[in-house]
Structure formats: structure tokens, C-alpha cells
Amino acid sequence: MQDVIFFDQRPRPDRDQTPRERRYYVWTVGCQMNISDSERLEAALQGVGYSPATRPEDASFIVLNSCSVRASAEERILGKLGELVRVKRQHPDTRIVLWGCMVGPNNRSIFADQLPMVDHFVSPSAVDEVVALAPNPIYTLDEPALPVRDWSHPPVSVHVPIQYGCNMTCSYCVIPLRRGRERSRPLAEIVEEVRRIVARGAKEITLLGQIVDSWGHDLPGRPELADLLEAVDPTPGLLRLRFLTSHPAWMTDRLIETVARLPRCQPEINLPVQAGSDRVLKLMRRGYTVARYKTLIARIRAAIPDISLTTDIIVGHPGETEDDFRQTMDLCAEIGFDKVHIAAFSARPGTRAAEQEQDPALAVPPAVKEERRRRLEQLQEQIATERMARFLGQTVEVLVEGESKGKWRGRTPGNRLVFFSHPADLTGQLVPVKITATSPWSLQGVPQLDDSVNAQSKENGLVKAR
């Protein structure tokens, strides 16, 4: 997964009269997989009769969905649990659940001693198990909950997990220890879930997995991600289809060809390289070389010339020298990624890299990690500035996601953020936008729409005052 995100829910105003005993509070830290899990949980809780609360003290059922990718994420959760001690003291009947990647198979007993305010510890993605702990349900679910918590305003884009767990043994990653081995959801189940989501108003689907390219290898018949894309692409009403996160060892020519051919598959691939040094890649146990990665990038660009390539990089992994880091800088400059998610190495208990960091000869000082992170960010900002400048004067297709600070916000097929002004509510529509200004991180433009759009918007009552 990519960035660590902190996500909180907001209540539906039409349910303000729900008593405290049927209110929940969900607080989520982590990647898009965690956010999707929490959305599905909230939908399920609402389905059994609960409503969201804006504050934990207003809820009888509190769930913290945790992340272990970096120490800072765990610190956020522990800090939140510290705040909940007061809530538990005021309302002893409050039920608190610690959910997600902090809860592994071997640490529940440890947490039970360290975190007495927590009533239950639940492993990642186990939505049904969490729902079963809610103390005051009044309904039962007729069908599986979808990963959308509020259908009163259907989201334009929805992430759909297709796989849980990970079989890789990357030196720095704790996810396999917490989420377990890979488990692929059946193709028919995913296709039906996508159909239900799109039928209710979503326009874009992102298929989600820790190593999304490996989906299906554990299912009967060993289907591939390309097969799933073929099955999802024709969904009526679907405008765009994406997937993440990929792994260089699992990216196949067939998958590349499928992305290039299918009309709704977007020209974007997130392909984490993690380092530009073969020596560091070996320490990381990534399973490929820099040369192999470059060859793969060349094949992708040959098949999909307008591809948007993003990647993840860790700086300061134990054993990384200044020369190793310079090789990473050189790789970024050579490939020219559209976006790079950069993280300084954070030792996670139980991983091989955490053991390596105990060796003074391998450990990279925190100040050096931070300095390398800043240097790489500066380089990537220069690269992104140049790559985004190519769009100046071009007209791009934008799927409008919503409003932000008085402008409409949307994304191009390559997932580049675009802002523009228009009096009509264009949410969920594909809009041609001529780019008039660029920055490293977003584009500004003018919609290329005829007067009939404005007239139709007025007729439908969609024009907003600005």
C-alpha cells in the first residue's frame, strides 16, 4: 500500500436523534485497504441499526482500525486509546474494539495487558467479527455490506478489495505478519460487488490488493488479474477501472496488454521499486534487479505510451550507503516517475530489517534518513514539474469527483488531479478541460462545454451560487 492516511467519519444529519446505545464511532489510520474495510464496517453497522457519532463519548461502540506500516501510525492509535480512557470512565458500558494491522496472531495477550481500556482485539479485514461485537443491533443484514458508508451521496470512486494478506517476505514489511497469507476473493463475488456498487451510482472502481497482480493464484483454476479485469470492464455504467498495488515480480505481459486494450482500464500503474540499488534490493528481499525493473518499465511504456507511472521508495533501509542512495536518485531521474511515495525506513518489530538495524554497521542514522528523504523529494518535485508542464494547453478528460474550495476537483485517466470552475454540478461526469496552469501536484483548467450543459443544469436545479 502507499501513504498512511488518517480518516474520520462524519455523521448523517438525518440520524441525529438516534440514542447513544445505537451509535458507533470509527477512527481509521492506514492505507486505502484500511479505509475500505472501515467503509464496509460502517455500512454494515448502519445496516443493523446503528448511526455514526461525531465524538467517541457519544457512541456506545467504538472501533479503532489500526496500521503498523510505520511507528507513527501505531503512535496515533495509542494516543487515541489514551483519550478513550476518559470516555470509558464516564461511560463504563462503552465497548472499545482495536482492529486492524496492530492486532497480529501473536500479540493479543500482550495488548490485553498493556491496553486494559480495550474490550476486544480483532484481526484486519474481519468486518463480520467486528459487527458481531456491536452490543445493540436491531436488524440483520440481508446481503453483504458494500465498502461505502453513505449512499445518500454516492461516491464517484470506490476501492474494492479483491485480496487480503501477502505471501512476500520483504525485509521491512510487517503486513504478512499481521494480515496473514494471501487470500483471493472469488471472481464472481468481486464482479457482483462491482455491479452493485456501480448500479448505485459509482463511476470508477479501483481493485485493491497488497500484491494485486498475484490475485487468483490461490483460487481453483488459478485465474489471473487480467481475467478479472476482463470480467469487470463491461460492467454497465462503469466509466473507469484501476488497480493497485502491483509488484514487479508479478507484472506480466498479458496484464500489460490487457490494460492497454480494455476501454475502461486507465493508463496508470503503481509499481513500487523501493530502491535503485541492487545491493539494497537484495537486502530488502524484493526479488528483482534494477535492470529487470527498467526492462519492465520499457515494456509498459511501449504498450501504453501515455501511461502514468507511480512508485514507492524507502530511504535509509539498514545497509543503504550514500552510493546506494545516489543510485536510487539516478533511477528516478532516468525513469521520470509521475509520482513517488517516499518514506524514511521505520523498523517494525518482527521483521528482518528490524534485526538488521540493531547492527551498528548497517543502521542508518535518523538524520541521514531525513536528509535523503528531503533530497529525493526535491528531485521528484523537479521531475513532476516537468512532466505536468507537458499538459499545458492540452484538453484532458476529467472525471469530476466533487467540490473543493470553490472549484470542481477531478482526475485525468492517468490519475492527475485537475481543478476548474463551472456553475453547474458536474459530479460524476466526464468533462473535457483545457489546461491553463500546471504545478508538480495538480493541473488547473477551463471546461470545454457548450451552452446546452449550462441550460440543462439550470433546468435540473444544479447550478450553485459561488
Curated annotation (Swiss-Prot):
CDD domains in UniProt: Radical_SAM (cd01335)
Keywords for the protein's UniProt record, in alphabetical order: 4Fe-4S, Cytoplasm, Iron, Iron-sulfur, Metal-binding, S-adenosyl-L-methionine, Transferase, tRNA processing
Cofactor: [4Fe-4S] cluster
Gene Ontology molecular-function annotations: 4 iron, 4 sulfur cluster binding; metal ion binding; N6-isopentenyladenosine methylthiotransferase activity
Domain Radical SAM core stretches: 152-386
Matches recorded under InterPro entries: Elp3/MiaA/NifB-like_rSAM, Methylthiotransferase, Methylthiotransferase_CS, Methylthiotransferase_N, Methylthiotransferase_N_sf, MiaB_methiolase, rSAM, rSAM_horseshoe
Binding site for [4Fe-4S] cluster 2: 166, 170, 173
Boundaries of every MTTase N-terminal domain copy: 22-139
Transmembrane regions listed in the UniProt entry: none
Entry keyword annotation includes Nucleotide-binding: no
Predominant localisation class: cytoplasm
GO CC terms, sorted: cytosol
Residues reported to bind [4Fe-4S] cluster 1: 31, 67, 101
A GO BP entry: tRNA methylthiolation
Cofactor binding mode and count: Binds 2 [4Fe-4S] clusters. One cluster is coordinated with 3 cysteines and an exchangeable S-adenosyl-L-methionine.
UniProt keyword Ligase present: no
EC number(s) from the headed UniProt entry: 2.8.4.3
Subunit structure: Monomer.
Full protein name: tRNA-2-methylthio-N(6)-dimethylallyladenosine synthase
